[in-house]
Amino acid sequence: MIGKPRGRRGVNLQILPSAMTVLSICAGLTAIKFALEHQPKAAMALIAAAAILDGLDGRVARILDAQSRMGAEIDSLADAVNFGVTPALVLYVSMLSKWPVGWVVVLLYAVCVVLRLARYNALQDDGTQPAYAHEFFVGMPAPAGAVSMIGLLALKMQFGEGWWTSGWFLSFWVTGTSILLVSGIPMKKMHAVSVPPNYAAALLAVLAICAAAAVLAPYLLIWVIIIAYMCHIPFAVRSQRWLAQHPEVWDDKPKQRRAVRRASRRAHPYRPSMARLGLRKPGRRL
């Protein structure tokens, strides 16, 4: 009598991650409908909802131990719709339809998202990747590409018409985003980022400010996120190169890696670039 309800509840919970993925697809497709009806605010809100559901479904699957090959395939298809097709069509309908090149650049973006997702799936099955590879994306992830696209619409909503709504700038930005998607540039995964304990209070303060900005100035917050993400890329490249040169720390925790890097800097105070330029530390004689 008691075992059956528990079993039934277990089966129901197993489909929860896939149900969340399907809901995210519905949100993404409905965003296109609102864009066609000239309601960009609703379209942007639904894309954000799709992104939130996309970020949660995988975590819920791991918590419930409900990971499956079918769920992974559905999630990949949802990413293609929500972060490839939907942002492209929303931006085209809202801003690019009057420009002859508009359709070409949104097609380029959508195709690059699909190629990027295909490469990601292929790398997941590649057993030859180094141990640190799971900490980095290869190229810009699809959700970040969608934020970059919606950022153009956010500029228009915040500041109205201007050079940022011109055909040449829109084409340049969309093309640049498309190139980043299929590039080989390493970009840090969020779950691989660790915050030292002494910065925890500052991080919580930043999160509180972001929560307030999401209500008071959501369009500006989108651009703060875009700029912050772009600024992290050089640090991600540097981190990936350092890890590639130090296989002895691949299995270490972030705190231990930071200690190794500090020790390395103390052991080699002069960087190669300083030596090439003939630079020296202040107060030292040649």
From Swiss-Prot:
GO molecular function: CDP-diacylglycerol-serine O-phosphatidyltransferase activity
A GO biological-process term: phospholipid biosynthetic process
UniProt name for this protein: CDP-diacylglycerol--serine O-phosphatidyltransferase
EC numbers, comma separated: 2.7.8.8
GO CC aspect terms: extracellular region; plasma membrane
Compartments (UniProt record): Cell membrane
Enzyme class: transferase
Alphabetized Gene3D superfamilies for the sequence: 1.20.120.1760
Keywords: Cell membrane, Lipid biosynthesis, Lipid metabolism, Membrane, Phospholipid biosynthesis, Phospholipid metabolism, Transferase, Transmembrane, Transmembrane helix
TM segment ranges: 15-35, 74-94, 95-115, 135-155, 167-187, 207-227
Major site of localization recorded for this protein: membrane
InterPro entries: CDP-alcohol_PTase-I, CDP-diaglyc--ser_O-PTrfase, CDP-OH_P_trans, CDP-OH_PTrfase_TM_dom, CDP_ALCOHOL_P_TRANSF_CS
Catalyses which reaction(s): a CDP-1,2-diacyl-sn-glycerol + L-serine = a 1,2-diacyl-sn-glycero-3-phospho-L-serine + CMP + H(+)
Protein topology in the membrane: Multi-pass membrane protein
Pfam families the UniProt entry points to: CDP-OH_P_transf
Family to which the UniProt record says this protein belongs: Belongs to the CDP-alcohol phosphatidyltransferase class-I family.
Species lineage: Bacteria, Bacillati, Actinomycetota, Actinomycetes, Mycobacteriales
